[in-house]
Amino acid sequence: MKFTLTGSGRMGQQVADVINRSGIHEIASILDDRSVVTAESFLGSDAIIDFTVRDAFLQNLPAMLQSGVPVVVGTTGWDDQIESVKRRVIESGSSLLYSANFSLGVNIFLRTVREAARLIAPFDQFDIAFTEHHHTGKADFPSGTALRAAEMILSVNPRKRTIVRELFDDRKITADELQVGALRLGSVFGKHTAYIDSEMDEIVISHNAKNREGFASGAVQTAKWLAARHTASPGFYTMDDFLNEMLA
């Protein structure tokens, strides 16, 4: 497969390294913040992998969709535009797969957290909270992965109804609120933890990324999957769609 990469930051460089070391894939082009992006920028590509920033992704989206090349997006921070993006993808007849985190380990972790949140739902003595820890260069907080985890918890645990990102002064959290804490420190690639607590027990479920290769490898793997189904089944996809098919 031939890939066009949009974004030449740390994740873009890691994806390029995975592709170059694969022995079977190649890079058609790399577009950075100095590139003028048009539909023609993606000619000769089998898939696009986007790791940029919110504004760049939204600005480049029309050209990517117009090109007809399937797009895998790891850029985060645009969740408020997700319904608009879904609509544009469907109207274009193209394909886009979005995930805040392409690590297979993280996605297995997320499903484990969701199942744990479902299991404790009938038992009032158990409470649940979530934290994430990333390097100081990460711009968005809480991370897209943490917010995805929070949404999954809320979807299966009716005792939690809203997400609280920060607590100020003497404000106390209420029983129906799910706290999602964020820490920016050092050079941590990414650590996500769910805490389940009662007066009698504590359950801790955690995922700690050792490097960025897991994210990059997952992005390449999902791009292959998306390209294979793009012609017959275009549309908007998530990591759940990929995993559901792989685990079927």
From Swiss-Prot:
Catalytic activity: (S)-2,3,4,5-tetrahydrodipicolinate + NAD(+) + H2O = (2S,4S)-4-hydroxy-2,3,4,5-tetrahydrodipicolinate + NADH + H(+); (S)-2,3,4,5-tetrahydrodipicolinate + NADP(+) + H2O = (2S,4S)-4-hydroxy-2,3,4,5-tetrahydrodipicolinate + NADPH + H(+)
GO cellular component: cytosol
Annotated pathway: Amino-acid biosynthesis; L-lysine biosynthesis via DAP pathway; (S)-tetrahydrodipicolinate from L-aspartate: step 4/4
Keywords: Amino-acid biosynthesis, Cytoplasm, Diaminopimelate biosynthesis, Lysine biosynthesis, NAD, NADP, Oxidoreductase
GO MF annotation terms: 4-hydroxy-tetrahydrodipicolinate reductase; NAD binding; NADP binding; oxidoreductase activity, acting on CH or CH2 groups, NAD or NADP as acceptor
Catalytic EC class: oxidoreductase
InterPro entries: DapB_C (IPR022663), DapB_N (IPR000846), DHDPR_bac (IPR023940), NAD(P)-bd_dom_sf (IPR036291)
Endpoints of the signal sequence: none
Binding site for NAD(+): 32, 74-76, 99-102
UniProt keyword NADP present: yes
Subcellular location: Cytoplasm
Main localisation: cytoplasm
Listed EC numbers: 1.17.1.8
Active site: 134, 138
Superkingdom of this protein's organism: Bacteria
Entry binding sites for (S)-2,3,4,5-tetrahydrodipicolinate: 135, 144-145
Biological process, per Gene Ontology: diaminopimelate biosynthetic process; lysine biosynthetic process via diaminopimelate
Residue intervals passing through the bilayer: none
Family in the record: Belongs to the DapB family.
Job of this protein: Catalyzes the conversion of 4-hydroxy-tetrahydrodipicolinate (HTPA) to tetrahydrodipicolinate.
Protein name per UniProt: 4-hydroxy-tetrahydrodipicolinate reductase
Lineage of source species: Bacteria, Pseudomonadati, Chlorobiota, Chlorobiia, Chlorobiales
Designated gene of the protein: dapB
